Design a protein with these regions (language model features):
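Beta-rich interaction/scaffold domains
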Residues: 1-184
Length: 184
C-alpha cells in the first residue's frame, strides 16, 4: 500500500542527517491500521502526510570546523615570510559555504587543501646584505698589516648561508660578529 511504501521510504533515511526529523516520526506514528475500503481517502491522506513530511526535511549543515581552523592557521601566518603564498590564498578563497551534511566530504577536502597549501609553503631566504658588506670590508683590508687577523677570519668562516627569513637575527649577528672582529 501507499502507506507501507511511505513508511519504507522514511525508514531508509538517516534521521541524524536532518535538522528536524520529528515531523516524519509523528506522521509514521499517526498511522492507524485496520481501516476498511470505505476509509481509503483517510489511508491515502496518511501516506500523503508521511510523503509531505519527508519532502519537508532539511539536511543539517556540513561541519566547517576543520575549514575554519585551517583558515585561522593560514591567517596567523605572515605571508611576507614565504616565497609564494598564493596557493594558500587560493585554497582559502575556494571555500564554498552553505554545504549540507551530505556534502561533508567536499567540505573536508576544502580544509585539506588549505592544510596542504600551508604545509607546502617555503620560507624566503634571509637577507645577507649586511654580511656581504662586512665581508667586503674584510676583503679590502690587508691582513699583513695586522698582528692577529684570525678573529676576523674566524668570524667570516662562521657565516652559514642556509638561513631563512625567520632566522634573520642570526644572520644579523653574523654580520655584527665580523664588524666586531674588524674593530678589535
Amino acid at each position: 500500500t501507499k502507506v507501507d511504501a511511505a513508511i519504507a521510504k522514511a525508514n531508509v533515511l538517516n534521521k541524524d542527517n536532518y535538522k528536524d526529523f520529528s515531523g516524519v516520526e509523528a506522521a509514521v506514528n499517526a498511522i492507524v491500521r485496520d481501516k476498511n475500503i470505505t476509509e481509503q481517502s483517510e489511508v491515502d491522506a496518511m501516506a500523503k502526510t508521511i510523503e509531505d513530511a519527508i519532502n519537508a526535511l532539511v539536511y543539517k549543515d556540513a561541519d566547517y570546523t576543520k575549514v575554519d581552523e585551517a583558515i585561522a592557521k593560514a591567517n596567523a601566518l605572515n605571508k611576507d615570510n614565504y616565497k609564494d603564498f598564493s596557493a594558500v590564498e587560493a585554497a582559502v578563497n575556494a571555500v564554498v559555504r552553505g554545504k549540507n551534511i551530505t556534502e561533508q566530504s567536499e567540505v573536508d577536502a576544502m580544509a585539506k587543501a588549505i592544510e596542504d597549501a600551508i604545509t607546502a609553503l617555503v620560507y624566503k631566504d634571509a637577507d645577507y646584505t649586511k654580511v656581504d658588506e662586512a665581508i667586503a670590508k674584510v676583503n679590502a683590508l690587508k691582513k699583513d698589516n695586522y698582528k692577529d687577523f684570525s678573529g676576523v677570519e674566524a668570524a667570516v668562516n662562521a657565516v652559514k648561508r642556509d638561513k631563512n627569513v625567520t632566522e634573520q637575527s642570526e644572520v644579523d649577528a653574523m654580520a655584527k660578529a665580523i664588524e666586531d672582529a674588524i674593530t678589535a
